[in-house]
């Protein structure tokens, strides 16, 4: 194949769809790009290979792009995100034993995140009183949306995620096995691994993350700033190929074809039926077959999901500050926002953006607390009594 050769890493997750479809459907080739996709297992591998130049671009968890750019937790390598690969798509899954305990302790409908969170607080307190080990939850990386989503849900209901439970890092493909082996009591991960746990009869999906935050930037197409400066035309072509892929994925007429593509062993490696449920936002949430639907479960191209939103970057930085991963600084806040580049998206796709109807006014839509002001992180932090500042 002739074209600009690029090496791009990805994790087997549904929100890699735009990248995978861009290659497998030929949109990248039509843009003059010869992309080698490299399937990885952990976010640390992805980050390190992007940072040192082994990868030209990557399917990257959004907070990692920010942390790398700010030099948090690792070497400082400025990263740009000209395209958002997915908004939402995570879920919180728990073991049958923990699900039963939460249901028994709940004062109301556990589909309400506040009800389930307060029930979790009671279960955690009961375990502590009996001298038992704390509940353990898996998340994918310290600088991850999964970490922040678990913490936001728990802390809003007075569960201290550092004192009342344990949070441990696990690669996404290993979450299900860890739950089956009782190494964890629950986890937060992206699709399709929550559905895989339910289908195996070992997990209950407690919440879609879209029930906790109406709009949460999840993965981005990450490139090194230096690479973007050296390859502006290639970057534009790469974003255009992803834009075509996102539109193709969101067309219901293409769902069967897309599901089959993503199900391939060298892509995500699960059944096409599980992928189709994910794309449709129609998931079995219990081994017995109970189904929950949400049009917001995973947004790839709808509702301006692919356009990077600096407000989302500001919210992620605020979580880093809240949980002691970063100092509070106007310079760091500005640096975090600068990672998300809607100007590059617009330059590539030539679209004039306007607010989408039905989207949260603060661009976040959290289930608890005041609205988020991207220019006043101090007020956001002051609203919460649990944190590690």
Regions found by a protein language model. Give the residues of each.
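Active-site glycine-rich loop that binds ribose-phosphate moieties when present
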Residues: 121, 169-173, 229
């Amino acid at each position: 194949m002739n074209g600009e050769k690029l090496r791009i890493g990805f994790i087997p997750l549904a929100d890699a769809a735009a990248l995978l479809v861009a290659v497998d459907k030929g949109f990248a080739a039509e843009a003059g790009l010869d992309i080698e996709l490299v399937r990885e297992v952990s976010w640390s591998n992805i980050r390190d290979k992007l940072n040192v130049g082994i990868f030209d671009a990557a399917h990257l968890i959004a907070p990692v792009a920010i942390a790398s750019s700010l030099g948090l937790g690792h070497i400082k390598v400025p990263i740009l995100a000209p395209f958002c690969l997915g908004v939402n798509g995570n879920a919180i899954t728990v073991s049958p034993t923990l699900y039963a305990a939460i249901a028994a302790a709940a004062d109301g409908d556990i589909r309400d995140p506040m009800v389930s969170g307060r029930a979790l607080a009671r279960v955690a307190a009961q375990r502590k009183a009996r001298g038992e080990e704390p509940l353990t939850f898996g998340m994918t990386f310290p600088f991850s949306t999964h970490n922040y989503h678990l913490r936001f849900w728990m802390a809003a209901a007075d569960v201290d995620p550092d004192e009342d439970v344990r949070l441990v890092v696990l690669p996404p493909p290993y979450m299900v096995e860890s739950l089956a082996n009782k190494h964890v009591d629950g986890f937060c991960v992206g699709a399709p691994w929550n559905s895989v746990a339910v289908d195996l009869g070992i997990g209950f999906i407690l919440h879609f993350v879209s029930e906790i935050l109406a709009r949460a930037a999840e993965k981005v197409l990450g490139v090194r700033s230096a690479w973007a400066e050296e390859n502006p035309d290639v970057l534009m072509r790469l974003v255009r190929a992803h834009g075509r892929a996102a539109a193709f994925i969101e067309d219901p007429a293409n769902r069967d074809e897309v599901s089959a593509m993503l199900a391939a062993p060298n892509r995500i490696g699960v059944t096409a039926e599980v992928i189709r449920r994910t794309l449709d936002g129609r998931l079995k949430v219990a081994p017995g077959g109970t189904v929950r639907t949400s049009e917001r479960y995973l947004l790839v191209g709808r509702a301006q999901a692919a356009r990077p939103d600096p407000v989302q970057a500001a919210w992620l930085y605020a979580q880093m500050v809240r949980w002691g991963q970063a100092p509070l600084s106007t310079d760091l806040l500005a640096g975090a926002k600068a990672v998300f580049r809607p100007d590059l998206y617009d330059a590539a796709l030539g679209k004039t953006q306007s607010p989408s109807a039905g989207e949260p006014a603060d661009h976040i839509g959290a289930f608890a607390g005041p609205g988020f002001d991207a220019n006043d992180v101090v007020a956001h932090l002051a609203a919460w009594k649990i944190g590690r500042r």
